[in-house]
A protein has these predicted regions:
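Internal intein/HINT superfamily modules and their associated LAGLIDADG
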Residues: 1-176
Length: 176
């Protein structure tokens, strides 16, 4: 079997390994793995899923490839793709979150922020054990940060005194 491979050097942001083989390419295409999937992918027929609960795992796999988690003041979850694919994902989530990607007629983005992004990411990651670890860790960091922030605000409002009224409790919460 003729093949060609090219290892591309990894840096701190990305790594690429390229394998070219006609048989492998044809086999992957027969299973629906198409070139330029971000520009061509349509959501598969729901009947291919033995159980409808598996759809979120499929979406998570897609998100791991063409999604982004970023946070500053708010958490933002962003998924790039074709309008056909993202319309289906939007149907499972919230309306009015689908946008053209910088004026492109080929790619679109589904963007969630704040509570909607956290809910979307819980939908993807809850009780999951296969995921891109880098994105999962970002989700956990933000979730933990938001939990501590909300807990401190709740304590402050319930106690009726300043947040530093119980420094021992604050120390424990900060160590979570």
């Amino acid at each position: 079997m003729k093949h060609r491979y090219n290892n591309v050097k990894c840096d701190s942001f990305r790594c690429r390994w390229s394998v070219s083989n006609k048989h492998l390419w044809e086999t992957l295409n027969s299973y629906g793995c198409t070139p330029n999937k971000s520009l061509t992918l349509k959501f598969p027929d729901e009947n291919i899923f033995k159980d409808k609960s598996l759809i979120r795992h499929f979406i998570r796999g897609y998100f791991d490839g063409d999604g982004c988690i970023s946070y500053g003041i708010n958490l933002i979850a962003n998924v790039l793709g074709t309008i056909q694919f993202l319309q289906y994902v939007q149907k499972l989530t919230w309306p009015n979150t689908l946008r053209s990607n910088h004026g492109s007629v080929y790619t679109f983005s589904l963007t969630f922020s704040g509570v909607k992004s956290l809910t979307f990411l819980y939908y993807l990651y809850f009780n999951s054990n296969i995921y891109l670890d880098r994105k999962y860790q970002k989700f956990l960091q933000f979730k933990d940060c938001r939990f501590k922030e909300k807990s401190l605000k709740l304590l402050e409002s319930k106690i009726g005194e300043g947040w530093d009224a119980n420094p021992e409790l604050i120390t424990i919460l900060n160590e979570l």
